[in-house]
Regions:
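Basic/aromatic-rich interaction segments and small domains that mediate binding to polyanionic partners
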Residues: 1-52
């Protein structure tokens, strides 16, 4: 289960970073993407929890 502060990777590997906000009902997550150093909004279902 993904929470604020969780480290995640997108299924397409374009996002790797830390979750800042999420909503399971809306399938929404706001993530700080370490790969391009930007904040991105994506679908929560597109993310998987990842170890550092």
């Amino acid at each position: 289960m993904i929470f604020n502060g969780s480290i995640v990777t997108s299924l397409d590997k374009k996002i790797k970073g830390q979750v800042l906000d999420f909503d399971y009902e809306k399938d929404f997550a706001s993530v700080y993407n370490w790969l391009d150093q930007k904040f991105v909004d994506t679908k929560l279902s597109n993310l998987e929890e990842t170890p550092l």
